Regions:
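Extended hydrophobic leader/signal-anchor segments used for secretion and membrane insertion
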Residues: 1-136
Length: 136
């Protein structure tokens, strides 16, 4: 009886974790940081996790935006919001803001957290080990 209850509780916890993970994956995406314009906050090799949407964007947020010539997009910090609602951006390592403010419809997402260089690899290796141990 106790064993059946323990199995049921574990199964419920796994289902809950799977539901949370599915929701997070549907609402967030991972972006590889490929350059140094956001250093020291983000450096090349970091893995940035961004949430979809533009709600609640404010000065100081780091956003992923579409930029011509940059297929993966650009991660830069919001330094101002213009009178017409466009975002003035600047990379933390850049001395001046980007030339053209971007409209909200160019925003792909807002930075939620990041995994520093090396930690991303370790995280996914650990995740793979956990999944493998559960399957065997």
């Amino acid at each position: 009886m106790k064993r059946a209850r323990a199995v049921a509780v574990k199964a419920a916890m796994v289902l809950l974790a799977a539901a949370v993970a599915a929701w997070a994956l549907a609402c967030m995406k991972a972006v590889y940081v490929g350059g140094g314009s956001m250093s020291p906050a983000l450096i090349a090799g970091d893995l940035a996790i961004v949430r979809d949407g533009t709600s609640g964007i404010k000065v100081g947020d780091v956003v992923l935006v579409d930029k011509p010539g940059w297929p993966a997009g650009v991660l830069h910090r919001v330094v101002a919001v213009t009178f017409d609602g466009r975002l003035q951006l600047r990379g933390d390592a850049n001395p001046t803001p980007d030339l053209d403010p971007v409209p909200l419809d160019a925003v792909r997402g807002v930075l939620v957290f990041f995994l520093p260089t090396g930690h991303a690899i370790a995280f996914f290796e650990a995740l793979a080990r956990v999944v493998q141990s559960r399957l065997t």
